[in-house]
Amino acid sequence: MYQLQFINLVYDTTKLTHLEQTNINLFIGNWSNHQLQKSICIRHGDDTSHNQYHILFIDTAHQRIKFSSIDNEEITYILDYDDTQHILMQTSSKQGIGTSRPIVYERLV
């Protein structure tokens, strides 16, 4: 059985540059890792009170975003854009102790 994680990125578009918004949009969509049987759904919006995450850092040069849950800021996530079909997701504690290996996800069509 697949584990499904919803990530609702909450941010104010008026405070971001066009390049930063474009960078975030690279990650919007449905992604899956068939080997680990994990799927993630990344979207923008605060239309739900569940699974809300705020963006901590946007690295437009490396197409990377760092974010954490609004409910639990101790764990941070890093998304790296690999290509149009693949992203990498890595988790770590806010103090930087205990960083996980990146997990590769493939875009679901």
Curated annotation (Swiss-Prot):
Superkingdom as given in the UniProt entry: Bacteria
Region: Binds to staphopain B, residue numbers: 97-101
Short name of one Pfam family: Staphostatin_B
Compartment(s): Cytoplasm
SUPFAM superfamilies registered for this protein in UniProt: beta-Barrel protease inhibitors (SSF50882)
Keywords: Cytoplasm, Protease inhibitor, Thiol protease inhibitor, Virulence
One cellular component term from this protein's GO annotations in UniProt: cytoplasm
GO molecular function annotations of the record: cysteine-type endopeptidase inhibitor activity
Keyword Cytoplasm attached: yes
Regions crossing the membrane: none
Assigned protein family: Belongs to the protease inhibitor I57 (SspC) family.
Protein's job: Specifically inhibits the cysteine protease staphopain B (SspB) by blocking the active site of the enzyme. Probably required to protect cytoplasmic proteins from being degraded by prematurely activated/folded prostaphopain B. Also involved in growth capacity, viability and bacterial morphology.
Subunit structure: Forms a stable non-covalent complex with prematurely activated/folded SspB.
Note: Inactivated by staphylococcal serine protease (SspA).
Protein name per the record: Staphostatin B
Organism (species): Staphylococcus aureus (strain N315)
Organism ancestry: Bacteria, Bacillati, Bacillota, Bacilli, Bacillales
